[in-house]
Every structure is written in structure tokens, then in C-alpha cells.
Amino acid sequence: MKRQAKPPEKKTKRTTNASSPTPSSSSPSLSSLPDEIVENCLARISRSYYPTLSIVSKSFRSIISSTELYVARSHLRNTEECVYVCLSDKSFEFPKWFTLWVNPNQANSMVEKKRKKKKTIGKLLVPIPSSNLSPVSKSAIAVGSEIYVIGGKVDGALSSAVRILDCRSNTWRDAPSMTVARKRPFICLYDGKIYVIGGYNKLSESEPWAEVFDIKTQTWECLSDPGTEIRNCTIYRIAEIEGKIHFGYTQKTYAYDPKQGEWECCEGEVAFPRSQCVMESVLYTFANNYTWEDDYGCKWWSTDGYGEKVKGLESLLEIHKRNGGSSDNTTKLVACGGKLLLLWEGYMKHNPNNRKKIWCAVIALEKRDGGKVWGIVEWVDVVHIVPTSCKLLHCLVVSV
């Protein structure tokens, strides 16, 4: 039966190319090529096309989900940055992860298209397989092409688990667990290591208050005891500043010096923006507090620590304010592909279905007027609709 069915298939293919001068001039289908050649072709195009190509055939889907494809992309130096978003809600059995899909055919400016069509066509949150072992954790960090989810809660109990999301294949695996279970540890990446501090209410002095994970060797090492004052300190933020791990809050900060292995109290105030990112060695921050007009919005920071507002974003800030972005602290600012991305939870005034919107804006930057930084809003729209109880937990950028 298979031999009899084969000739009609070939005949059908020739019929579709009847307009060609000769049968030999018809182009072969990409799916008819060996997997190695298909893999090489797919490695040369933007990852934005992969969701569409993955539904062409099982063979394409298998190649697109393989790690070999991303090894080929790396060899071709065709890696690109992608945004991963995590949403958490009591109605979810586990936190849900998404990729921010960018329409490769969208125009440079989506603002005009938005006026013509209400339907989102530029960017969407596309779900990826969730881990049924992943804890509900507010501590996650991107390292290259992977995302580390550290600590949190599993079935209401504190967890020492570390789960890794490989963003090349969107698959999960376990990393070695921490030495201590932590609810919400504060984490910071520096020099190939993840520093983890605090994250629980009570702990005996014999148990490590802080530890560090070596990404290369995949091993944990406990840090020296910081003393009673630091153990009991209030921590709102953590950041690496000039080779030291700073943590605390604006009025009172501490630091750990990895080179000396010492803890210290810091003099003066250290600003810990709620949302920040670095692009081309420039720090950008976003503050939600619109009560003080100077603090509300996006700033860029010079090397001498002076912050100045990114100009030209007034219309975006109005949209952000009007759609609930300034009412909470969930706004996320990330740098991706040489542009700034702003994501936030938007609350609806008339909301009979108890739903809210996740908004996204894409901002291109350019320098004008003697070094002033201006933002050009290329696109702003809703990328997802969720229950009002849902939280925008993480927004991270990986390189794949």
C-alpha cells in the first residue's frame, strides 16, 4: 500500500509547481533536506520565527527543541536576547513561565498600528512547560541561557531546592540544593557566582546565614557568620556595587567583600531602585512613585552617580499611570536587544470578571542635545490578561 501511495504524492507536488518551466527548476522543500542542513538553516534565523515553524512538522518541532540547534547558533554567533516572564497565583498549581514573543514582521513603530487595531499583533506572552517541582519563589536570576529559581515554598514548607530552566530547550533540571531552606533569599550574581543571603525568620547561629553557589563547579560554600546586627537587619534590596555585595535599605546598608571574605557596615545612603537594568555599561532605573514627580519615571545614571530622566516618555508615563502601573511596585524594567522593555500589571476600573492586564512597552534610546538621553516608544500594548490576584513575579533576560 505504501508503494502505491507514493507516486500520487510526487504527482501532486509537481502539479503545484505547474507554472515552472521545467520540473527540475522547482525548489525542494526544506523538510525534505537532512536534519543537519535544516538545523544549520534554522540556526541562522531569528528565534522569533520558531513558534510558527514548530507547528510545521514533528521534525521541525524536534529540531527547534534540541540543544544542538542552540550550539549551532552559538558557533554561528547568532545568539539573541529573549525575555522570560513568571506569573504566580493561588489558582495556579505551580508558577507559570512565559516567553515574550516578538512578531518578526512588525513595523518599527507599533503605536500607529495600535490606533488602527485593538488586537495585539506585535508581542504576546507564550507559555512554556512549567515544572511540577518548581517552588513558588521570589528569588530567580538569569545566567547566560539559564534561569535559576532558588528557595521559596513547596506545599507551604520552606525549600532549599534550586531549579534551573534551560531556555534553549525550555526544560527544567535540578541543581544542588542549598544547605538551608530559605523562603525568600536575596540573591546577586557576581563573578560567576550566585550570592544568597537571609530568607528566613529564625535560624540558629550554627546555621549559615549566607552562602554562595559556584556556577562552574555547581557547588555551594557557606560564608562566614556576619554577626548579630547583620543577621537581624532589614533587607529590601541587594546589588553588586564596585565588586561588593550591598544589601539592606536606603537608610542602612551593609556589604560583603568577596575578595576579603569580610562583612562591613556602610556609611551614607545607597539607592536601591525597585527596577533597574544595565545596557551598554549605563544603569537605567524606573521608579513608580508619582507622588514626587521627579522620582516617577525612567532615569539613566552617569558614572559619577548622577541620575537624569530619560526624555520623551511623557505619553508612556500617562499610559502607565492611567492603567494602574503606578499603583503598585510590580513594574519591571529590563534591557533586551539594545532597547528597554517595561512590563507592569494594569488594573481595570470596571472589572466584573476580576481580570487585569499585563502591559508591555518597548523603548528605543538615542542621544540628543549634548548627551541627553531620549526615549522613543516603539510599541505599547497588552500582552496577557490574568486574574486580579495574579502577580508579575519575574521578568528576566537570557541569551540563547
UniProtKB/Swiss-Prot annotation:
Gene3D superfamilies: Kelch-type beta propeller. Residues 19-33 have a biased composition (Low complexity). InterPro entries: F-box-like_dom_sf (IPR036047), F-box/kelch-repeat_ARATH (IPR050354), F-box_dom (IPR001810), Kelch-typ_b-propeller (IPR015915), Kelch_1 (IPR006652). Pfam families: F-box, Kelch_FKB95. Kelch repeats lie at residues 146-192, 194-240, 242-284. The keyword Ion transport does not apply. PROSITE patterns: FBOX. Residues 27-73 form the F-box domain. The keyword Repeat applies. Residues 1-33 are annotated as: Disordered. Keywords: Kelch repeat, Repeat. This is F-box/kelch-repeat protein At4g19870. The lineage of its organism: Eukaryota, Viridiplantae, Streptophyta, Embryophyta, Tracheophyta.
